[in-house]
Amino acid sequence: MTIILGADAHGNDLKEAIKGFLQQEGFDVTDVTAIADDFVDNTLAVARALKADEESLGIMIDAYGAGPFMVATKIKGMVAAEVSDERSAYMTRGHNNARMITMGAEIVGQELAKNIAKGFVTGHYDGGRHQIRVDMLNKMA
């Protein structure tokens, strides 16, 4: 599994901290950040990479996390969540089969962001009764 990271200028420092942490934890990390680009373009770059590799997961960081979340959820078949705590990151994998999370560098600090990233990438989709909702989400966009 590859973890695809992206950030705009506001999220780049936090992204770098998460990147180093995930690499230290043994994860394969690909950074698609184009620092001069807006969060919209960087979110689309993460989403394109996720679409190209169905086994990958993505994390996109800007100042507040809301903008990238809105962009990601406009993409057909992309289930994403804006998170600011570890439990939500873990549960969105387990119950929603989210492939991307978004975070805000103005909302979470480095240690919390690392824990959020770890919760997300170590979570596993539970399937079963949750698949009904995932199917509903995939039909919507």
From Swiss-Prot:
Q: Which GO terms describe its molecular function?
A: galactose-6-phosphate isomerase activity; ribose-5-phosphate isomerase activity
> Which pathway is recorded for this entry?
Carbohydrate metabolism; D-galactose 6-phosphate degradation; D-tagatose 6-phosphate from D-galactose 6-phosphate: step 1/1
Q: What is its EC number?
A: 5.3.1.26
The record's section on InterPro entries has:
LacA, RpiB_LacA_LacB, RpiB_LacA_LacB_sf
Q: Is the keyword Phosphoprotein assigned to this protein?
A: no
The keyword Flavoprotein is annotated on this UniProt entry: no
As its record notes, the protein acts as a catalyst of: aldehydo-D-galactose 6-phosphate = keto-D-tagatose 6-phosphate
User: What EC class is this?
Assistant: isomerase
Report disulfide bridges, numbered on this chain.
none
Q: How does it assemble?
A: Heteromultimeric protein consisting of LacA and LacB.
> Known PANTHER family for this protein?
GALACTOSE-6-PHOSPHATE ISOMERASE SUBUNIT LACA (PTHR30345:SF5), RIBOSE-5-PHOSPHATE ISOMERASE B (PTHR30345)
Q: Which family does it belong to?
A: Belongs to the LacAB/RpiB family.
Q: Which NCBIfam families match?
A: lacA, PRK08621.1, PRK12613.1, rpiB_lacA_lacB
Protein name per Swiss-Prot or TrEMBL: Galactose-6-phosphate isomerase subunit LacA
- What is the source species? Streptococcus equi subsp. equi (strain 4047)
